[in-house]
């Protein structure tokens, strides 16, 4: 299942998972974090 209410800096797959409602991809990497 998906994890919601993630703190800034935690890995995410979509913005809805983050407290800040923003899932940002790091440049040059496939990982995204809140």
Curated annotation (Swiss-Prot):
Keywords assigned by UniProt, alphabetized: Digestion, Disulfide bond, Lipid degradation, Lipid metabolism, Secreted
GO terms under cellular component: extracellular region
Tissue specificity of this protein: Expressed by the pancreas.
Keyword Secreted recorded: yes
Subcellular location: Secreted
InterPro entries documented for this protein: Colipase (IPR001981), Colipase_N (IPR017913)
Major location category of this protein: secreted
Paired cysteines (S-S): 12-23, 18-34
One of the Pfam families matching this protein, by short name: Colipase
Record carries keyword Lipid metabolism: yes
Any single biological process term in GO: lipid catabolic process
GO MF annotation: an example: enzyme activator activity
Stated family: Belongs to the colipase family.
Function according to Swiss-Prot or TrEMBL: Colipase is a cofactor of pancreatic lipase. It allows the lipase to anchor itself to the lipid-water interface. Without colipase the enzyme is washed off by bile salts, which have an inhibitory effect on the lipase.
Subunit structure: Forms a 1:1 stoichiometric complex with pancreatic lipase.
The protein's name in its UniProt record: Colipase
Source organism of the structure: Gallus gallus (Chicken)
Lineage, highest ranks first: Eukaryota, Metazoa, Chordata, Craniata, Vertebrata
Gene name as annotated: CLPS
